[in-house]
Swiss-Prot record:
Swiss-Prot/TrEMBL GO biological process terms: apposition of dorsal and ventral imaginal disc-derived wing surfaces; asymmetric cell division; CENP-A containing chromatin assembly; chromosome segregation; follicle cell of egg chamber development; germ-line stem cell population maintenance; heart morphogenesis; imaginal disc-derived wing margin morphogenesis
GO molecular function, one term: transcription coactivator activity
Top-level taxon of origin: Eukaryota
Organism of origin: Drosophila melanogaster
Region (8 X 2 AA tandem repeats of V-G): 1092-1107
Family the UniProt entry places it in: Belongs to the mastermind family.
Biased composition (Polar residues): 218-232, 817-827
Basic and acidic residues composition bias: residue spans: 175-192, 462-477
Identification of the protein by name: Neurogenic protein mastermind
């Protein structure tokens, strides 16, 4: 009831005031206060305060008269003490007088003082007046403070109030019902209570609370409620800060409460869950838990086991929620998890009446964070009504109470989610509510079950909204809850064992059909959600069983599918409501990667970060695995059994059963993998995959997941890193089919691939049509409409999917072997897990081979798809999935692969839901459809970046071109373009698989570049990771891009900032698109930011290099974009694109003159300009792009700076204090700087390489998306956290290396420099990357750099210049030019100018200027430190030295560019090393060295060529990595670059192998302190061990 939080927040000052108030308020009748407070809490916060004042005045008069002052004094003392302790505060509040505390603590706290004095003034004795006056004064102070805090706490407070009110009501209902249900004695009261009690319970419960508050209920309920209130607020306060770890705290109360046998076991569940959830329940997050608990309670009431199950749902949900809170962006995610658990309980319980309904309610509650907290479906009918509707209308809830959760659900479904659903998702309920529709259609019981799902969906959606929820949920769901997950399973196994068995039996019954009819029926069912309807009991049971296991994967799949996916997914990262598993969303919701993980976790949302998730997940897995075995079909894919796998298995079964993206979307996306990988991509996938990704992720996930399934642990994990995790999971879902395909693709089943492609193309075309339909409407953003569309399209989708599934199944039959055989590729695919192992290469290469092979045939598409298949599963997934996802949206590219996923459904759902519930993600409709898909593709992993890029490329292009119907068209266009791109790039792809593709198809480029990266062997590794990160980046950027595209880009960005999660996705989309644009099609506008991005992903990198270089020359554009962009390209592309502009021009132009121009534009964005130089061709489009990009850049730069300023990054750092913070901090700085760059630098970002770009871009773009990135960052970072060492290295590498991305700002060069590629390879080598952890280093270094850069800023700009992107970013053409005059000249001039200028130059300069200066300074410092630290890595050192020299030279020579000849080399070195350093600094110093060498070569070559140089330099770094980088670098010299690229690729391999050979000893000469002067660097270069000439070696 109490806001509790306010006093808690104000506890110190209010303690006294509250004590006084409490005397008065305690005098007030608690009943009145409780009732009124409940009502008031329902009212607006301010209104509540006013009402509280009036009411409290009245009550104060009454209470004062009624109560004794002595008691008041005693209570004051106690309450003061207790208030200081929120938990006690709740209890005393209950005993002392909830009203008093409520009034005092609640909004009333501040207002009460006024009221208190007023009432007392009238009725108070004179002796009391002084107290009243003091209170008045004090309260006025409090009021003022509250006025300040209200905005902050308003949401939390309202949520808390509503949730607590609902919670109180629900708790009492549940409490009573729990007694009734559990006791079964009071079962009769259940229905009456729900209906009557809803109102009566509010009154009675309030009264009872008032009475019981003094008595057991007062202790139990109040303890639960108040504590939950207190906890909730504290949770809000603490949790977000404390992060996931606090999860246990919030959980503790639940556990404590559960431990406390307040009433009966049911009460424990109810009371506990309620208390636990109650705490959460009060808050939205609490409600989620509450509802989750409601579900638990209901379920619990039904069975203790269900309690556990309920616990499970609640816990998981909470975690997700918390993760979200940690992410701050996705409260929904947590909710989602809770819902899932609740759902599971309800479903498992099989008691449709109360139990089933209850579960849903919880979900709903969570969905609403605020509103639904309670009921949303009110775990019980009561909960539903109370919680779900409670928010909207208690009356309806009352009516629906019997309906139970379902009724709420029904309302939610119909109402759009009575309280919460409507609220959070608005469409969520709608989403699930829409989903709920089936529940409505279903019998009440089924509804209850479904309702739970729907509620789950709702929860997911909602969570996004309630920030507090996240905290509270997290708390609750954080640790203990997750264990609850096993409990859920355990309970399931024990108590609900029979029910569960029944469910399993039902599943078995359905499994044959699902598995056999898996394509058609399940699809129909799932898609339509009719599936739920159609097989409501079975489906629900299956879902429930799955949910229990899968975390509602199936059920969520359903509800989640439309629902969760829909907006929630889109909206809330975790919203993957589609995830419904809650996890995906949760994880997604966990907006942070962890949140995704959480969502994933479903699995303990954040728990991802938390081990419990893994351990628990394993438990679940074991349990689920058993269940699955029991279930029969479920066992279908034992592989998955990793933490995720159980879910995946279930999902796989579900996939078989439902194959709809929904499950994938819900579970896969959210669940296991994210859970597993939250650290990695888990967050990402969820971030990406989460909502938006859902679709793509599903597609890619489907595509990827099969592989993941095959290599569930490794592959999944890797997926995790990428958006892939969720995506993978989803892909798993579809992938069972597609996996086969993809596996086959991986296996080089050209025939199958072709068939698949053909079928997929057909399907995708259908999908396109459908998506277009959906997207257009969705673009409309009408959630309901989305539902309709979903339904309408779903049938189409179903048909298509059925067809696809049938085809796929057929193919699967054909290819089923291939999944296993693919396991080899998958093993390669493991590259995700073990990117280094060429896994990407293994996968991708095979994929590439396949792609290359297919290139001829399906050519680009297949390559992408294949890459998708092969790569797709991995980061490349992007290549594949990327192709897929983008293809999914752009399905034609992705067609074959994407088709497999048919995230399209997901996309559709996502789109619809995202469109409908979309945050600001308007794209969600179209974009999110794609974004979902794309995001997921991205999520898929880096590949998804590619995907993003490609997809969004097309989408963005289309969206940009066709904002309204964009998505539909976009997919096509993009597909077409990507297609064309592929064709054009196809060759590139062939080379850089990704590259060629990428080239033409930015998306593919990136995808394939991702592949390339993967293929890049050395870079590959990094790339995988990079990609993952890229994915995040992309997502964010995509979202931005998407958002931007769809709406006013600025607005979207703002929105993005607002809906960072969505924004992140959008940004990612935007980037992806930008990348795609860079690739070309989209190049125009949107791409600006993306430019850097997308392509940036230098995925192309390694391969890119070779390819980029080789293809790069020709396909280079693609490579550039793609390869170079990709990674190498990134740099190269970035630089190459941007820098590579020159290169781009050459390569880009070569690649696709048109695309090139676009790509250049894109890349150019920076590159474009760069390109401009290159083929003037780019310029024209580039110029247009320039303006657009500049505008974009400026907007982004603005955002970035703001974000910089805002320190968006910092919060994410909070996410994982350590690594995450460092990374985030670095990312922030980088992003801030780089971010600016990323976006502005996008060119840079691209430079940064897609990796960097992706990364850097991610952050860089993120900078633009900083807001998005903030969350994303967290997510990505957390992933990097786990991956930190490996991935972090990569991450950092990406960041640091590609991260130029971060650096990207200036780092672009950095990242761009080989950042991506380097990052890729570096990643492996990067371990020094750990120094990247020092990313803090880079940060610290950067700062120092900043100082240096400050002085040398102009030069620095030049310095950034090295990062063509940098230059881009740093924008000052001079910057680029300055630095690498050589580069700068062409690149700098064109590239830089264009890059900087084009990309950033206008915007860049403004954008970067601050950022560049800061970034660069940081960079310089970083580099210095890194040099010092990474003296190992000569490259970086050299880079620094070179940079330093270069800077000095630049300063000295001024143009420095003129230094070209010798300085050119120096500059090349500098550039190279600067870029590389920047790029490599953190990323591979080795590669950087190598890259440096190569880079130098190329750069020198490029330098020779000039323009290429700049890009080349970075490119060269990329070259090494990027190979493409070479391309990029080569970009300047595409020819030499190409040769160089080839040699560089070799060199990279050799160098990377020998990278240690580069003596970094010279760095040893450098003063260790970061203050060492440039001269020191230069002097250090004099070291005999270090010869620039050594770097010159080809």
């Amino acid at each position: 009831m109490d806001a509790g939080g306010l006093p808690v927040f104000q506890s110190a000052s209010q303690a006294a005031a509250v004590a006084q108030q409490q005397q008065q308020q305690q005098q007030q009748q608690q009943q009145h206060l409780n009732l009124q407070l409940h009502q008031q809490h329902l009212g607006l916060h301010l209104q509540q305060q006013q009402q509280l004042q009036l009411q409290q005045q009245q009550h104060n008069a009454q209470a004062q008269q009624q109560q004794i002052q002595v008691q008041q004094q005693q209570q004051q003392q106690q309450q003061q003490q207790q208030q200081q302790h929120s938990p006690y505060n709740a209890n005393l509040g209950a005993t002392g007088g909830i009203a008093g505390i409520t009034g005092g603590n609640g909004a009333g706290g501040p207002t009460n003082p006024g009221a208190v004095p007023t009432a007392p003034g009238d009725t108070m004795p004179t002796k009391r007046m002084p107290v009243v006056d003091r209170l008045r004064r004090r309260m006025e102070n409090y009021r003022r403070r509250q006025t300040d805090c209200v905005p902050r706490y308003e949401q939390a407070f309202n949520t808390v109030c509503e949730q607590q009110n609902q919670e109180t009501t629900v708790l009492q209902k549940r409490f009573l019902e729990s007694k009734n249900k559990r006791a079964a004695k009071k079962t009769d009261k259940k229905l009456p209570d729900p209906s009557q009690q809803h109102q009566q319970q509010q009154h009675q419960q309030q009264q009872q609370h008032q009475q019981h508050q003094q008595h057991q209920q007062a202790q139990t309920m109040l303890a639960g409620q108040l504590q939950s209130s207190v906890h909730v607020q504290q949770k809000f306060l603490k949790r977000p800060a404390e992060d996931v770890d606090n999860g246990p705290d919030s959980f503790e109360p639940p556990h404590k409460l559960p431990n406390n046998n307040n009433n009966s076991n049911s009460n424990n569940n109810n009371g506990n869950a309620n208390a636990n959830n109650g705490g959460n329940g009060s808050n939205t997050g609490n409600n989620t838990n509450n509802n989750g608990n409601s579900t638990n309670n209901n379920g619990g009431s039904n069975n203790n086991g269900s309690e556990n199950l309920t616990k499970f749902s609640v816990e998981i949900v909470q975690q997700l929620e918390f993760t979200t809170s940690a992410a701050n962006s996705q409260p929904q995610q947590i909710s989602t998890n809770v819902t899932v658990k609740a759902l599971t309980n309800t479903s498992v319980k099989s008691e449709p009446g109360v139990g089933g309904g209850g579960g849903g309610g919880g979900g709903g509650g969570s969905g609403n964070n605020n509103n639904n907290g309670g009921g949303g479906g009110g775990g019980n009918g009561n909960n539903n009504n109370n919680g779900g509707d409670h928010h909207q209308q208690q009356h309806q809830q009352q009516q629906q109470q019997q309906g139970g959760g379902l009724g709420g659900l029904g309302n939610n479904g119909r109402g759009g989610g009575p309280g919460g659903m409507a609220t959070g998702p608005g469409g969520v309920a709608g989403g699930l509510g829409g989903m709920g529709m089936p529940p409505n259609m279903m019998s009440a019981q089924q509804k209850s079950a479904l309702g739970n799902l729907a509620n789950l969906v709702e929860c997911k959606r909602e969570p996004d909204h309630d920030f507090p929820d996240l905290g509270s949920l997290d708390k609750d769901g954080g640790g203990g809850q997750f264990p609850g997950f096993p409990d859920l399973l355990g309970d399931d196994n024990s108590e609900n064992n029979d029910t569960f068995k029944d469910l399993i039996n039902n599943l078995q019954d359905f499994n044959p059909s699902f598995l056999d009819g898996f394509d058609e029926k399940p699809l129909l069912d799932i898609k339509t959600e009719d599936g739920i309807k159609v097989e409501p009991p079975n489906a629900q049971d299956l879902i429930n069983s799955l949910n229990v296991k899968s975390e509602g994967g199936l059920g969520h799949g359903f509800g989640g599918f439309g629902l969760g996916l829909d907006n929630p997914g889109m909206k809330m990262r975790g919203g993957n409501p589609g995830n419904q598993g809650g996890f995906p969303n949760g994880p997604n919701g966990g907006t942070g990667g962890a949140p995704n993980a959480g969502g994933n976790g479903g699995n303990s949302g954040n728990l991802m970060s938390e081990h419990p998730l893994a351990a628990q997940t394993l438990k679940q897995m074991a349990e689920q695995h058993q269940h699955k075995n029991a279930m029969g079909g479920m066992g279908g894919f034992p592989r998955p059994p990793h933490g995720m796998n159980p879910q995946q298995q279930q999902q796989q079964q579900q996939q078989q059963q439902q194959q709809q993206a929904q499950q994938q979307h819900g579970q896969m996306m959210g669940q296991g993998q994210p859970g597993r990988y939250n650290d990695y991509g888990g967050g990402f996938p969820n971030d990406f995959g989460l909502g938006p990704n859902g679709p793509q992720q599903q597609q890619q996930a489907q595509q990827q997941q099969p592989q993941q399934q095959h290599l569930p642990p490794q592959f999944h994990q890797q997926k995790g890193p990428g958006p892939g995790a969720g995506m993978n999971v989803q892909q798993n879902f579809l992938d069972i089919k597609q996996e086969l395909f993809y596996s086959s693709q991986n296996d080089f089943d050209l025939k199958r691939l072709q068939q698949q492609q053909a079928m997929q193309q057909q399907q995708q075309q259908q999908h396109h049509q459908q998506q277009q339909q959906q997207q257009q409407p969705k673009m409309g953003g009408v959630p309901n409409f989305n539902k309709q569309q979903q339904q309408q399209q779903v049938p189409q989708q179903q048909l298509q999917q059925q067809q696809q599934q049938q085809q796929q199944q057929q193919q699967q039959q054909q290819q089923q072997y291939s999944p296993f055989s693919n396991q080899n590729p998958n093993a390669a695919a493991n590259f995700l897990n073990c990117p280094p192992r060429g896994g990407p290469n293994g996968n991708q290469q095979p994929g590439n081979l396949a792609q290359q092979q297919q290139q001829p045939g399906a050519g680009p598409q297949q390559q992408q798809q294949r890459g998708n298949a092969a790569n797709g599963q991995q980061n490349n997934p992007n290549a594949g999935p990327g192709g897929n996802t983008p293809n999914a949206p752009q399905q034609q590219q992705q067609q074959s692969t994407t088709t497999t996923l048919q995230m399209k459904q997901t996309q559709q759902l996502h789109i619809s839901q995202q469109g409908g519930g979309a945050h600001g993600i308007q794209v969600s409709a179209g974009q999110h459809l794609h974004l979902s898909g794309d995001m997921k593709s991205n999520v898929s992993v880096a590949a998804q970046q590619g995907v993003f890029f490609s997809q969004q490329q097309a989408q963005q292009q289309q969206q940009q071109q066709q904002p309204g119907g964009t998505n539909g068209p976009n997919p096509q266009q993009q597909q077409q373009q990507p297609h064309g791109g592929n064709a054009g790039g196809g060759v590139g792809v062939g080379v850089g698989v990704g590259v060629g593709n990428g080239g033409p198809n930015p998306g593919q480029q990136q995808q394939q570049p991702n592949q390339n990266m993967s293929n890049a062997n050395v870079p590959s590794d990094g790339f995988s990771l990079s990609q993952s990160q890229s994915m995040n980046f992309n997502q964010q950027q995509q979202q931005q891009a998407a958002a931007q595209q769809q709406q006013v880009q600025p607005n979207m960005r703002q929105r993005q900032t607002q809906a960072q999660a969505a924004a992140a996705a959008a940004a990612a989309a935007a980037q992806a698109q930008a990348a795609a644009n860079a690739s070309g099609p989209n190049v125009p506008l949107m791409q600006q930011p993306q430019v850097g991005v997308g392509v940036g992903v230098g995925v192309g990198v390694g391969v890119g290099v070779g390819n980029g270089g080789v293809v790069g020359g020709p396909g280079s554009g693609g490579p550039n974009n793609g390869a170079m962009n990709q990674m190498g390209g990134p740099m190269g592309g970035m630089p190459g694109m941007q820098m590579g502009g020159p290169m781009n021009p050459m390569q880009m132009n070569p690649n696709a003159a048109g695309p090139t121009a676009q790509q250049m534009m894109m890349g150019s964005g920076a590159g474009g300009p760069g390109q401009v130089p290159g083929p003037g061709q780019g310029p024209n489009p580039n110029q247009a792009k320039f303006l657009q990009q500049q505008q974009m850049m400026r907007a982004q730069a603005m955002q970035q700076q703001q974000q910089h300023m805002s320190g968006a990054r910092p919060p994410p750092p909070e996410y994982n204090a350590t690594k995450a913070q460092l990374m985030q901090a670095q990312m922030m700085q980088q992003t801030v700087g780089g971010g600016g760059v990323g976006v502005g630098g996008v060119g840079v970002g691209v430079g940064v390489g897609g990796v960097g770009g992706a990364n850097g871009g991610r952050f860089p773009n993120s900078a633009a998306q900083a807001a998005a990135m903030r969350r994303m960052t967290q997510q990505p970072i957390p992933p990097s956290g786990p991956m930190m060492r490996p991935q972090h290295a990569m991450y950092m590498q990406q960041h640091g290396g590609a991260g130029g991305g971060p650096r990207t700002g200036m780092g672009v060069p950095y990242g761009g420099g080989a950042g991506g590629p380097m990052g890729g390879p570096q990643q492996q080598q990067r371990p020094p990357n750990v120094q990247v952890t020092p990313d803090g280093m880079p940060m610290g270094s950067q700062q120092e750099w900043r100082h240096m850069m400050m002085t040398q800023q102009q030069t620095q700009m030049g310095f950034g210049g090295p990062g063509p992107g940098g230059p881009m970013r740093q924008g000052p053409g001079g910057f680029n030019g300055g630095n690498f005059m050589p580069n700068g000249a062409p690149n700098g001039a064109a590239g830089s100018g264009p890059n900087a200028g084009g990309m950033m130059s206008g915007p860049n300069v403004p954008q970067m200027q601050l950022t560049p200066a800061q970034m660069q300074q940081q960079l310089m410092r970083q580099q210095q430190q890194q040099q010092q630290q990474q003296q190992q890595h000569m490259g970086p050192g050299a880079a620094n030295n070179m940079q330093m020299q270069q800077l000095l030279q630049q300063q000295q020579s001024g143009g420095g560019g003129n230094m070209m000849a010798s300085q050119m080399q120096m500059t090349s070195m500098h550039m190279t090393q600067t870029q590389q350093q920047i790029t490599m600094q953190q990323q591979q110093q080795f590669v950087q060295s190598t890259t440096t060498t190569t880079h130098q070569q190329q750069q020198m070559m490029q330098m020779g060529p000039g323009g290429g140089g700049g890009g080349g330099g970075p490119g060269s770094a990329n070259n090494n990595n990027g190979g493409g980088g070479g391309g990029a670098a080569g970009g300047g010299n595409s020819a030499s670059t190409i040769a160089s690229a080839s040699s560089i690729s070799q060199t990279i391999n050799s160098v990377v192998a020998n990278s240690n050979d580069f003596g970094l000893e010279f760095l040893d000469n450098l003063p260790v302190d970061s203050n060492f002067s440039t001269q020191d660097l230069i002097n250090s270069l004099d070291n005999d061990n270090f010869n620039l000439q050594d770097f010159n070696m080809p």
